[in-house]
Structure formats: C-alpha cells, structure tokens
C-alpha cells in the first residue's frame, strides 16, 4: 500500500512538472540556450524557432553565442500561452520544444515604439511617444565608467532616445585602440607609422562585443530610453575597415545582429549615419542591407537611414518607418 502511494505521488509530481512553464512579461525577453558542439564554423549553423501564441505565429532566428552554446531570443507580443519548437539541420538543435506564459508587462514597460498613422509615434500599449533625442556616438565604447555615467546623465535628463554607433569611430587619429572588436582577428601587422593593421575574419563574430552592446541597450531600457542603433558609419577612415566591408560580410553581420537584438523592445534600426559618405560601399548595397534587417526582424522595429545635409533617401519605400533628416530647412 505504501509502495503504491509512493508511485502515485511520483506520477503526480511528474505530471505537474510537465505543466510548469516559464513566465515572461509581454514585450520582455525569453532566451533559450542549447549546448551543442558542431564541426566547422558554428556561426554558419542555421537555427530557427517557431513560436505559436494567441492568434499569432512568429519565427525567429537563433545564433551562436560562443562556448559551444546556441541561443534563441524571443519577445512575446501578446499575453497568454506560447509554444515553441526549434528547427535546424543539427540534430542537437532540432526539435527542442517548450512553452512559456506571457504575463502583463511590468512597470515602465510600454513595449516597442511604433508608427501611429502617418505622423505620430506610440508605444505598443497605446501610450503616446514624443521623441526627444540626443546623440552620443561612442558612449558604449569608451573605457572606464563613462558608459555608466552616460546612463545616469540620461536618467536625469528629459531625453527619451539616443543615437549611437555600433562600430567604434575614428574621429580622432589618436583614439586608443578598443579592447575588443565585433569580429575575430586573423592577423595584425604594422603600417609604416607603426600603427596596427587588422585582417578580419568576417565569418566569425566576437560574442563578447555584441553582449556589451546588448547590456548597454538594456541599461537604456531600464530608464525608458530608446536605442537608435547606427549600424554603419563613415567615421572609420579605413582604420579598422568596417566602413568598407564586402557586401556578403555586411549581410552576414546584419543577420547575426538582428538574431541577437530584435527581441530588445527599445531598439531602433538606423542603417547608417551619413550613408552617402560611405563611398567604399556601392549605393545599391543599402537596399540589400535594409531588406536584410527588415526581413530578419520579426517584430518590425522602427527602421530608417540617415543622410548628409539636405539629401533625402527613398523614405517612401515600405521598409522605412520614418525619415532621418539632417537639414535645417524643414523647421525654418
């Protein structure tokens, strides 16, 4: 009799455990981590997950995060139960199933900003959003405690958006070499002035660099600030060569970035700052880059491209949600 009761208790606990599920707030972030060792370049591995929720199905891309670990990040957009299953040609990554419960958003979480009609913005929960922005190109890449100081200064200000560079900048030739880069380094040589010349492996990323940017974006979300992330910029001058990547390398970078960061509710995509000064990149690249970002962002975050003074891009194209204009004429 005691033995039968013991089996019954074990059976009940097993069934109860089957119904246990992780909880994540609406427009929060849920992360799946799957250990797997693969042959060849792990950044070549294709991994997706399909999430089925209340009247909604979303497919998101996974990514390799180093240390034999693959991850999938998901931002639930409706409250209720969500069920997921992964897809991959790698057996260890394929068919991983689970479920989560999306609960009400916490305090200060209004969801991502969207376009409201033609001329206005609002958060996903319907709260009106009036952008009051600033720019700090490389605040994330400065050594020491300056990134933390920047966040504290923003918290005390009235700004609710900041434009910032994903790649480091070279405005100052004496700007110190960064402690890390977004790509693996194949080789470092010296030029005639003794300065380092880098040869990059654009097929392999440095997850630590991306994780640092992500932590900064999360810190901004914590104080209610939108992160207008500039994906390319002309302020490299060939020092590191991120302003002249081959088309294939640029597309690969954007796919990896969107897989990692589309689930961040406060992210905005700015394809470039003063894109027309990126003269090593062909004009037609920008359509490809834009399509890559939009097609790999299942949440349709705000997307634009910034031009030089009094120049306008094809903002009427459906991929662009708003204009990013550097011109005093519209307000004169």
What is the predicted role of each segment?
Residues 22-26, 39-42:
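Short, solvent-exposed loop/linker segments at the N-terminal edge
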Residues 110-331:
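Active-site mouth of glycoside hydrolases
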Residues 19-20, 330-332:
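Short, intrinsically disordered, charge-balanced linker/junction segments flanking boundaries
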Residues 24-30, 66-68:
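Ser/Thr- and Asn-enriched, surface-exposed coil loops between beta-strands
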Residues 29, 44-48, 59:
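Exposed beta-strand and adjacent loop surfaces of beta-rich binding modules
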Residues 1-22:
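Bacterial Sec-dependent N-terminal signal peptides
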Residues 50-125, 139-141:
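Extended acidic/polar, glycine-enriched regions
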């Amino acid at each position: 009799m005691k033995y039968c009761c013991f089996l019954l208790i074990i059976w009940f606990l097993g069934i109860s455990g089957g119904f246990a599920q992780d909880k994540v707030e609406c427009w929060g972030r849920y992360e799946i981590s799957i250990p797997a060792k693969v042959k060849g370049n792990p950044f070549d591995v294709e991994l997706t997950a399909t999430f089925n929720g209340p009247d909604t199905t979303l497919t998101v891309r996974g990514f390799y995060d180093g240390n034999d670990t693959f991850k999938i990040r998901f931002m639930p957009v409706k409250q209720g139960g969500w069920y997921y299953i992964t897809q991959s040609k790698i057996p260890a990554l394929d068919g991983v199933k689970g479920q989560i419960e999306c609960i009400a958003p916490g305090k200060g979480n209004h969801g991502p900003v969207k376009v409201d009609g033609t001329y206005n913005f609002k958060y996903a929960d319907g709260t009106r959003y009036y952008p009051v922005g600033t720019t700090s190109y490389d605040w994330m890449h400065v050594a020491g405690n300056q990134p933390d100081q920047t966040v504290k200064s923003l918290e005390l200000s009235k700004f609710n958006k900041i434009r910032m560079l994903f790649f480091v900048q070279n405005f100052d030739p004496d700007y110190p070499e960064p402690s890390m880069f977004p790509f693996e380094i194949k080789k470092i040589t010296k030029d005639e002035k003794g300065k380092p010349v880098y040869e990059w492996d654009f097929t392999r990323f440095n997850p630590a660099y991306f994780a640092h940017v992500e932590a900064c974006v999360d810190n901004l979300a914590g104080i209610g600030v939108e992160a207008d992330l500039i994906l390319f910029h002309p302020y490299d001058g060939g020092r590191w060569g991120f302003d002249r990547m081959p088309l294939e390398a640029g597309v690969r970078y954007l796919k990896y970035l969107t897989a990692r960061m589309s689930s961040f509710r406060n992210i905005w995509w700015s394809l470039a700052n003063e894109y027309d000064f990126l003269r090593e990149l062909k004009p037609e690249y920008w359509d490809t880059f834009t399509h890559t970002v939009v097609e790999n962002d299942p949440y349709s975050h705000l997307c634009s491209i910034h031009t030089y003074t009094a120049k306008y891009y094809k903002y009427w194209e459906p991929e662009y949600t708003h204009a990013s204009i550097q011109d005093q004429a519209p307000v004169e």
